[in-house]
């Protein structure tokens, strides 16, 4: 196929793109661009792709296109760079937790965790994800049951406090 022979040209999700554009009235023309793929979506498993679609939907829902948000942009860049070499599902959930905080709705408050019945282990994982520094190695093993509990909690949190019904809710719970 053309995609296999020539590649995507860098115009795909999760690609760092630098471009030159000109404006003619309401129309923009891109005259040149260079790209660097941070996370190759074509190499993700179905389960991993679902998790990253969740991240895309989260960004679309909580970060208006008209408003620039450098923190969110840098956070996504770090997360994609790390995900290219580490556990992609874990990286997607970590960046989801951190993006919610940047959007101004912190899922890690004690009151919310109690109200939505997050276990002590879930609270600890939430705190670890919330404060994770993308430049460091992840040292702590993550139990699958606690990971799934936290993923379900984030879905409930977004629905209740973000007032958004995510189309990709449950993405982190998929197993094949």
Give the ranges of each region predicted by the language model.
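Non-catalytic alpha-helical scaffolds and adjoining flexible linkers that form interface surfaces
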Residues: 1-176
